Amino acid sequence: MACCAPRCCSVRTGPATTICSSDKFCRCGVCLPSTCPHNISLLQPTCCDNSPVPCVYPDTYVPTCFLLNSSHPTPGLSGINLTTFIQPGCENVCEPRC
């Protein structure tokens, strides 16, 4: 029996400003946080169909000002969410379930 359900994705809960653009791949559609003029780290949540890895690990740092400033285009802006969440059944994806 598999330890985790396939395609199950999880990130730590908490307030965040989610900004994903089409030129950056955000696994499971999750980007965490911040606000301009700071940089954000695109964090990839754990997917249960992979071998056990840390819940969240940094991927790429990108400036976000151009996405938040209306005087600049927003290439591929896909959405802005205010909170993160954990899918049902994935609360402890970093713990072995076998």
UniProtKB/Swiss-Prot annotation:
GO CC entries: cytosol; keratin filament
Free-text function comment from the UniProt entry: In the wool cortex, wool keratin intermediate filaments are embedded in an interfilamentous matrix, consisting of hair keratin-associated proteins (KRTAP), which are essential for the formation of a rigid and resistant wool shaft through their extensive disulfide bond cross-linking with abundant cysteine residues of wool keratins. The matrix proteins include the high-sulfur and high-glycine-tyrosine keratins.
Family, as annotated: Belongs to the KRTAP type 3 family.
Free-text tissue specificity from the UniProt record: Wool.
Keywords: Acetylation, Keratin, Repeat
InterPro entries, per database record: Keratin_matx (IPR007659)
N-acetylalanine modified-residue sites: 2
Region (4 X 5 AA repeats of C-C-X(3)): 3-59
Organism: Ovis aries (Sheep)
Sequence repeat residue intervals: 3-7, 8-12, 47-51, 55-59
Name of the protein in its database record: Keratin-associated protein 3-1
GO molecular function: structural molecule activity
Assembly description: Interacts with wool keratins.
